Amino acid sequence: MEYLLFLLLFAGFLTFLPRFLIYAQITSSTTTTTPVPAANRRTIRVGVAAVQTTELDSIGWPMSGGAINMAIQKLRDDGFIAPFDFEVTVNYTECDRSLGAAVGMEFMRTKRLDVVIGPPCRDPMEIMATMATYYSTPMLGWGLVTDSKFTDTERYPYLTNIMANSLSLGFSLVKLLEMMEWDRVALVYEESAQDYPLSVINDVETAINEYDTFAVNVVVKQALPGGDLNDAQYISVLNRIKLRCRIIVSVFQTAPTRRRYLKMIDQQGMANEEYVHILLGLRSIGFGKQSAGLTKCELNCLSSGLAPFWDIAPDDGLNDRLKQAATRMLVMDLSTDVPDINYLNTFTMNCGAVVVNPPVSCATPACINASTSPPSAFARSLHDVFYLYGLAITNLYNQDPAYLNDIDKINGALQLNFAGLTGEVSINANNSRVPKLMLYALNDKYDQASFMNLTYSLNGGAVSVSLAYTNEASLWYWYGGKRPLSVPVCGFAGTDCPQSFVDQYGALVFAIGGVLIFAMLFVITCFFYVMRQKRLERDRIDAEWQIPLVKLQAPPKRDKERMSKRSLQSGPSNITDTSKMTFDNTFSNYSIFYLDKEPVLSTAHPASNLIRTDYDTFVRLRKLDHENVNKFVGMSIDGPEYLAVWKLCMRGSLQDIIGQGNFSIDPFFMFCVIRDMAEGLKYLHNSFLHVHANLRSGTVLVNESWQAKLTDFGLGTLAEEKKPMKRRQLWMAPEVIRGTLLPHQIEKSADIYSLAVIASEVLTRKEAWNMAERKDTVDEIVYRIKKGGPNAPRPELDMDGVEINHNLLILIRDCWSEEPADRPSADVICNLLKNMMPKKGNLMDHVFNILEDYTTNLEVEVEDRTKELTAEKKKADVLLGRMLPKQVAERLKQGQTVEPEGFDSVTVFFSDVVKFTQLAAKCSPFQVVNLLNDLYSNFDAIIEEHGCYKVESIGDGYLCVSGLPSKNGNAHIKQIVELSLDFMSYCKSFKIPHLPREKVELRIGVNSGPCVAGVVGLSMPRYCLFGDTVNTASRMESNGKASHIHLSAASYTLLMKHYPNQYNTASRGDVIIKGKGVMETFWVFERNNQFMGVSSNSGYQSDKKATNNGSSPESTPPSTPPMHEVKANSPVRHRKPPSPSSPTLSKRSVSPIMEAKARDIHNEETEALYRQFRRQETLALI
């Protein structure tokens, strides 16, 4: 016995262990939100009117209260309510009105709590919601409070209900009945102490009575008794329904009562294809139920994550049978789609356990024992309503903490949308939940599936339906794909089956039908044969002008030369005869395609609905044939836009020829072009078109024989524009511009006006109205033309010395007359032009003579341009040679890449103007620029004498190099030394014009060694040096002295090896160089007169023993400054050198060399900082 007891206790421990682990994880979870200081935190006092023993499985506090703790933890995990703490006060109303009033007085009057979560029962909620209105306290509703009365914002302005009201459920039901044409229903509901199912049924009945577009007859309204002892009464109610109705609407509060109903209808034979059972609910569970234990649904669970309500454990043998019966049931409920199924499972398994935790802290025995119980039916609603409140106060606090004391602000902040445990929660402006109902049914896999989405508008009362199926037969899968009828075909008793029509009139119908079918088949066959012949003929004709888009091939693109971005060489010049037309400069208003390897022109038009008349027009357009009318090839209408295809005229449009101005047009050519246009217009006016309606110089093409041809005509609606381009109105007649005529009402006289404007372009050889030289804008000219009158503007006929028949000018003026009736017809114009013909001859011969003259002039012009190009190229080469070394520039000009090149031995020269900052401070910016320009111009001349290369000059700094890019053996050291001495010599004689007392002194540094040089950059390429040799030369300059030439050991060694005794030099001694350590450096003072043959008066003297004569240090003149000495005005301050007799200095402790090194270290660091500051100040001054 003891062993059995131990096994039971161990099994209980194993059952509780997973629950404990998950709970521990929840209670220990932390958020990453920023902690709020204690002074800024606020405690929200929450009052909860709960029930402890009433309706325990539905709304009982021990099985529901944990939802508040779960909601608080969820809010904190999601980053909300960080500045808040919660104090929860719970009082029990037990769904009693009087207790509800007492609790309401305590919460709202005595304690003045911040928010009250109302009782989950209808009667006490009505009392407390009224009190909340009086005391202006926000109140939250959940549970069994679905009555439509709670949506009345005048009575309950401060009530926010998370539950959808049952009246919206009723209207949605009636909408479903209307769609399915079910006009007879039965209403059944579960008996309940709180009358929740009855209140839902009452609202449903109210919706049925108020629905005015579809009448529904409620044949039975009956409560279904509870308890197994009342089966006989239960069966009696179902039998009444069987005799009166097939559509049964039911409301149940709990899953067991739903299962019992399913069991009873199966026993009574009401679970077949004749019956439809519509189950109503507002709990977001559909066909599901709350888990019976603490484990989540593992087997036979629905897609919503819940177990089906017909499944019980252990199985009583009816689970499978009742599952089959459930296929005859539809469920209308709030959406069961919960985005976070994992959190739903966590909530289900932990809601009962956390009720004992703060701030809820329920310590009753029922709460303590609830840890092993599932949450109540409406616990998820309590969770969502508290989560909604937490979101609202967080938003208000973030806006202004004072808003938490404003009841209207709180009320407005509660109007939120979020995804909760009861589905998608949306609170509208009335602080009521927008009901988003779903119609669920079982699919072929016995799984819950949604087939409709019904949304009820609380303002207008309308129900919008969104179908989740494409074929209604999928909804009735278990009914054989057919919708059940409200009244069976054979009546409710099965005795009223009507006699079929076939039985009554079958023989007669078959006889008459056979004759009629034969006659109809004959007529239809004849009709389709005739229609097919007509269609084939029509298709054959239409195929002549219809051009498939795939047959229009774009012309091949011409190859373009690509130049290397590293090459500076000029590309070859391609000079061609400008009289040769190309596709790029000839057809600015057209597109070029190849059709069957022949080039054609096309104009694009927006796609529109073409009618048969348009097709006939295109057929007739193809038949138009005249030497002055361009050939219409066809239309392409199978692309995104329509393309009208015309024959190609290689010379282009008349507008482009005149605009380019690259051809000399003489009077004979002008006359021929005007005559061709008139002949073409005459042909069109006498054709079926009667008018061109789009005539301008851009629609006049010129072919190879210089023959003008009219194009872009007769396209009807394709050519019409609702708002033509302003510039095109320059060719339009005044009556057309005024907009008084529709496109099909344009007369021939309008074309005559356009012809006159084009003629003015031809005669003046300028664009229409000469807009390039006119001060008037297009809008101003169009306005004056539209205004009309005797002084209406017209194009100028300035012939510019060209002799034209005066009668032709008179004819043009007559053609653009203000009155359409005064304009001559095309026939008259052609006759007059014939009489005015200046001479007879071939236009092509005339044009060829003009082209020969033009070619001669072009050759002369090309030769002049070539000379100019050669001169400019020489200038560019000179400029490039100044920017880069000649060898590098030549390689770049030839298109060759300049790779970086290494040099084994070069000499680098750095110089800097001493005290340049002080000099710049005494000068204006322009004087500084002039000073540097004068100085560097002479420096550049000295550089050219010595064959060195100037790399760059920045401010007062100067960088030169010898030994690259052309190698010169070891001569580079001598060239740099000579250059340095000449620089020093020049600076002695250089005078500053505006500062005659000031002198320019240089500090020069020289170093020799290997180096790498190369071109850097594309837009402004520069020849740059890289390597430690350059850095060391810069250090030689920065560590040098004014008017001294400072050599590194490498340069000195090279100089002495290849040019010994040619220069007076001296060792400076060991100097600490930044980045290099201790280095021995040298001075160069002057040329040696014995070997160079040139006297030197430089006056330089050595601090150390001279290397050319071996003199001792005692022989150094006293005027030679010591190594550590600095100018008096130098910003560097030095301590006074200690006396040789000082007791702190001994021959062993401090040597003269070490003393000089110490002073040089101090000098180097301070002088380097000072030089950097001086350069920045100089650049700022410039």
Swiss-Prot record:
GO BP of this protein: cGMP biosynthetic process; intracellular signal transduction; receptor guanylyl cyclase signaling pathway
Swiss-Prot/TrEMBL catalytic activity: GTP = 3',5'-cyclic GMP + diphosphate
Chain segments annotated as transmembrane: 508-528
Localization of this protein: Cell membrane
InterPro entries from the UniProt entry: A/G_cyclase, A/G_cyclase_CS, ANF_lig-bd_rcpt, Cyclic_nucleotide_synthase, Kinase-like_dom_sf, Nucleotide_cyclase, Peripla_BP_I, Prot_kinase_dom
Spans within the Extracellular topological domain: 25-507
Transmembrane helix listed as a keyword: yes
Biased amino acid composition, Low complexity: 1142-1152
A GO-annotated cellular component: plasma membrane
Tissue: Expressed in IL2 sensory neurons.
CDD domains according to UniProt: CHD, PBP1_NPR_GC-like
PROSITE patterns named in the record: GUANYLATE_CYCLASE_1 (PS00452), GUANYLATE_CYCLASE_2 (PS50125), PROTEIN_KINASE_DOM (PS50011)
Cytoplasmic-side positions: 529-1182
Gene3D superfamilies for this protein: 3.40.50.2300, 6.10.250.780, Nucleotide cyclase, Transferase(Phosphotransferase) domain 1
Gene Ontology terms, MF aspect: ATP binding; GTP binding; guanylate cyclase activity; peptide receptor activity; protein kinase activity
Residues annotated as domain Guanylate cyclase: 907-1037
UniProt entry tagged with the keyword Cell membrane: yes
Protein kinase domain boundaries: 562-849
Key words of the record: Cell membrane, cGMP biosynthesis, Glycoprotein, GTP-binding, Lyase, Membrane, Nucleotide-binding, Receptor, Signal, Transmembrane, Transmembrane helix
Membrane topology: Single-pass type I membrane protein
Main localization, broad class: membrane
Domain remark from Swiss-Prot or TrEMBL: The protein kinase domain is predicted to be catalytically inactive.
Stated role: Guanylate cyclase involved in the production of the second messenger cGMP.
The name this protein goes by in its record: Receptor-type guanylate cyclase gcy-19
Species for this entry: Caenorhabditis elegans
